[in-house]
């Protein structure tokens, strides 16, 4: 086998490793394993992800480009901080983009879109309908299914840039939501709330679906302010 052929086969494998590391690092930042403001030391990251510095630097540079990580002059990388002002900025923009996307999806959505909304809701409901203790045990699974459901709702909006910006803001909002999740008491499930959004979308009631999404996002903002003020408004 020629060196060129070996290189061609190795390149996709290297890309898969880089993407896997990026996904894991992002998930660990969102989940709080690396809290806001934490230094990201290469030695510790190499031990955690079992990859070289080049792969880590590539992943960290990408996360810096989307605002999840910051570059400290002469000190490497650190997790981006959080603040009340940033929460307000992220949430207000996300609400705007989410509402625009759901309205366009409802207008443009076809049978395949309807089926994806129903399927992702069904999977989400499979956890949200369970007892509180089981929901807590399956929280990480719920996070992924919740993301899938909300993506399905807006997936037919017809604008890749709107979807891209919405996904970026959603990740930042998820970090705030998970901060509050770790500090607030386990409440009732949100099955009825998600069912109402699903029903409004499938019935093509755009204004109602958009308002329900706004209320859900505002609920998240209120919970962050109530249960995680020490992160967004640290004492001076």
Regions found by a protein language model. Give the residues of each.
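Residue-level marker of regulatory loop/turn positions in helix-turn-helix DNA-binding domains and
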Residues: 14, 79, 94, 142, ...
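Short linear motifs at protein or domain termini
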Residues: 1-107, 221, 225-236
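C-terminal regulatory/effector modules of DNA-binding transcriptional regulators
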Residues: 2, 24, 48, 182-236
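Flexible, glycine- and charge-enriched loops at secondary-structure boundaries
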Residues: 15-18, 110, 135, 139, ...
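Short alpha-helical transmembrane interface motifs in multi-pass membrane proteins
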Residues: 83-84, 177-180
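Conserved amphipathic alpha-helical segments that form helical-bundle/coiled-coil interaction surfaces
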Residues: 111-178, 190-199, 208-219
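Short helix-capping/hinge motifs at transmembrane helix termini and TM-loop junctions
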Residues: 106-107, 158, 182
């Amino acid at each position: 086998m020629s060196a060129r052929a070996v290189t061609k086969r190795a390149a996709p494998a290297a890309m898969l490793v880089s993407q896997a590391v990026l996904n894991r690092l992002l998930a660990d930042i969102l989940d709080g394993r690396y809290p806001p403001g934490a230094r990201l030391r290469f030695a510790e990251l190499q031990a955690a992800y079992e990859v070289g510095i080049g792969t880590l630097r590539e992943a960290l540079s990408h996360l810096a480009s989307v605002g999840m990580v910051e570059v400290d002059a002469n000190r490497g990388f650190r997790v981006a901080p959080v603040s009340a002002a940033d929460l307000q900025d992220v949430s207000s923009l996300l609400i705007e983009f989410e509402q625009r996307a759901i309205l366009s999806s409802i207008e443009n959505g076809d049978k395949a879109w309807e089926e994806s909304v129903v399927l992702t809701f069904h999977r989400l409901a499979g956890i949200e309908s369970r007892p509180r203790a089981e929901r807590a045990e399956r929280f990480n699974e719920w996070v992924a299914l919740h993301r899938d459901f909300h993506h399905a709702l807006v997936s037919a909006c017809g604008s890749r840039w709107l979807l891209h910006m919405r996904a970026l803001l959603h990740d930042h909002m998820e970090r705030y939501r998970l901060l509050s999740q770790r500090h607030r008491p386990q409440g009732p499930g949100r099955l009825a709330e998600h069912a109402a959004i699903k029903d409004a979308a499938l019935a093509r009631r755009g204004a109602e679906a958009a308002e329900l999404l706004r209320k859900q996002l505002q609920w998240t903002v209120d919970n962050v302010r109530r249960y995680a003020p020490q992160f967004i408004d640290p004492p001076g």
